């Protein structure tokens, strides 16, 4: 039976940390891309967006000037 020493465990945790960071970055990129696409699709109709969930409120307001 082979036992892992502390060096093996720390290498495992370092690889796992890189793995989780990679997926967190991919998730953040997906959220940003979704928000960007949503705003491009609804840019003419979107002036204000409110999201209420529990104690959290997210409010987005677009401020722009009309072209002359």
Curated annotation (Swiss-Prot):
Gene symbol of the encoding locus: srnB
Primary location recorded for the protein, binned into one broad class: membrane
Record's keyword terms, sorted: Cell inner membrane, Cell membrane, Membrane, Plasmid, Toxin-antitoxin system, Transmembrane, Transmembrane helix
Keyword Translocase: no
Membrane disposition: Single-pass membrane protein
Biological function: Toxic component of a type I toxin-antitoxin (TA) system. Its normal function is believed to be effective plasmid stabilization through postsegregational killing of cells that have lost the F plasmid. Promotes degradation of stable RNA in E.coli.
Transmembrane segments: 23-42
Lineage start: Bacteria, Pseudomonadati, Pseudomonadota, Gammaproteobacteria, Enterobacterales
Name by which UniProt lists this protein: Protein SrnB
Protein family per UniProt: Belongs to the Hok/Gef family.
Pfam families: HOK_GEF
